[in-house]
């Protein structure tokens, strides 16, 4: 989450992985093969800005609601990679301008079968889960079943882990 921001509307951006809680996301079952993607640091979930459904709508964090803009499907893409498809928009998480530099904004876009839309989900190592994590926001509720993951974006052999830190 950009600048470790705990407020609603904070941007979700790409950043080199540093093993920090603000770079870790939980996939919380929402039924029907859908998930809410909750940030470990803020307790807020990935959401579509202003419930937008058009190409280029930014992905940000927001307190959990019942809205479909916060529900995602994990779509197998082969080679150990997945796409994250939003239920409301029927579009996948993508990176603005197909960039992989630190600070690149996450957005949704129609599935164009591009590398910039592929993600690798890695379990968070137990040693990181055991680190003291800041208390979640009051809006966060403890889900019945979650999977903690870190996401990784690879391009041209250089790895940049998905994060939310922006400077």
Residue spans for each PLM region:
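Lectin-like carbohydrate-binding module/patch detector with strong preference for beta-trefoil
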Residues: 1-167
């Amino acid at each position: 989450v950009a600048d470790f921001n705990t407020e609603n509307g904070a941007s979700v951006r790409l950043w080199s992985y540093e093993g920090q809680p603000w770079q870790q996301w939980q996939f919380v079952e929402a039924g029907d093969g859908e998930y809410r993607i909750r940030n470990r640091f803020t307790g807020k979930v990935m959401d579509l800005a202003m419930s937008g459904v058009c190409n280029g709508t930014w992905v940000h964090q927001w307190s959990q609601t019942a809205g479909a803009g916060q529900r995602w499907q994990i779509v197998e893409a082969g080679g150990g990679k997945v796409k994250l498809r939003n239920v409301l928009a029927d579009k996948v998480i993508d990176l603005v301008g197909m960039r992989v530099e630190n600070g690149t904004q996450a957005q949704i876009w129609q599935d164009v079968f591009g590398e910039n839309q592929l993600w690798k989900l890695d379990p968070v190592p137990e040693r990181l889960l055991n680190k003291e994590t800041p208390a979640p926001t009051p809006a966060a509720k403890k889900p019945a079943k979650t999977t903690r993951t870190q996401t990784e974006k690879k391009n041209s052999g250089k790895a940049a882990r998905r994060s939310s830190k922006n400077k």
